[in-house]
Design a protein with these regions (language model features):
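N-terminal secretory signal peptides that target proteins for export/translocation
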Residues: 1-9
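Twin-arginine (Tat) signal peptide motif
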Residues: 11-20
């Protein structure tokens, strides 16, 4: 499929890391700490920071998702519509694993059996099912959400938020969401949002109201629901004292950016995709473990689901 809205282009693009605690760093750490590597003296495992431990945990989950998706894609009884979805999940998970820095390998090569080692990388059983894939994606989105809310680094926060969005959307492709998430306004608990994010939500509100007025069901109902959701965020943000500079947020596209797609649908994709990018930025700017951070992560997932419902593609995340 074609590339979807490039969330990376708004601040998510990050330099590729070497493998977590890679050989050079591990050897340096071992030497600097004076750990004994001599005969009869098994070395201790190098210690990892909390940030590296979190990344490693997510990398292991990405590896498990890739493994599970690979089994499902190749299984003989897999539904013809599910197999390509599973293959797409596998390819994306492989890229996510690389972005996360890979799974930590403590030693450069085979070492004596007396040396401690890290836990093996998890992998799927040979009879893994579609439900197993849905479970690994659901678990992954929960892990990534918690990591995003608690991350100390702005860069990590944005990466983990994008990962939360990606795994949530992929889970929805396999098993459609049975119930809506807690609304952003409830999670925010009266916290303010940035001017840019407020403007993005207000642009979405206006666009959805216009689209609803010009459309017939079921598109009218979808647009009206989206307008209500965006309005609730705008009203709550203004009530909380967020700076309000919304002039110029209402420009409609003169034509569709995608062939065979109406200008209205293209507009809907545009405004909700812009909110995904703005929420990811907001998450990085908010303090760790606060309602504002949690609300931004929640808002990113919700906006991505709304954009996807209009046909936007986020397969390139993170």
């Amino acid at each position: 499929s074609g590339r979807g809205p490039d969330v990376a282009a708004t601040g998510l693009r990050m330099s590729r890391r070497a493998a977590v605690l890679a050989l050079g760093a591990a050897v340096t750490a071992l030497g600097g700490c004076g750990l004994r590597l001599g005969k009869g003296s098994p070395a201790s495992l190098p210690s990892a920071s909390q940030a590296e431990t979190t990344r490693d945990g997510l990398a292991r989950q990405a590896a498990l998702i890739s493994s599970t998706a690979g089994v499902v894609a190749q299984a003989g009884g897999t539904d013809a519509t599910v197999a390509p979805l599973a293959e797409g999940v596998k390819q994306t998970a492989d890229a996510q694993l690389e972005t996360l820095g890979g799974v930590w390998e403590p030693w450069a090569s085979q070492v004596p059996s007396s040396y401690p080692t890290a836990a093996p990388v998890p992998s799927a059983s040979a009879d893994a099912t579609v439900q197993d894939l849905a479970t690994t994606l659901g678990d992954g989105s929960t892990m990534a959400r918690r990591a995003a809310i608690g991350a100390a680094s702005e860069q990590d926060t944005r990466l983990f938020t994008a990962l939360t969005v990606a795994w949530s959307l992929q889970h929805d492709l396999i098993v459609p969401a049975s119930s809506a998430d807690t609304p952003r306004v409830d999670v925010a608990q009266g916290s303010r949002i940035s001017t840019g994010l407020l403007t993005s939500y207000d642009a979405a509100r206006y666009a959805m109201e216009e689209i609803a007025a010009r459309s017939h069901d079921p598109q009218r109902t979808q647009a009206a629901d989206d307008a209500k959701a965006a309005t609730s965020v705008v009203n709550a943000a203004v009530a909380a004292g967020s700076e309000d500079t919304r002039l110029g947020a209402y420009a409609a596209p003169t034509e569709s950016s995608t062939p065979d797609v109406s200008a209205q649908v293209s507009w809907a994709r545009q405004v909700w995709s812009a909110i995904v990018s703005a929420e990811v930025q907001e998450a990085g700017s908010a303090k760790a473990s606060t309602p504002a951070r949690e609300a931004a992560v929640t808002g990113a997932v919700d906006a991505a689901r709304r954009a996807t419902a209009w046909g936007a593609d986020f397969s390139s995340l993170p």
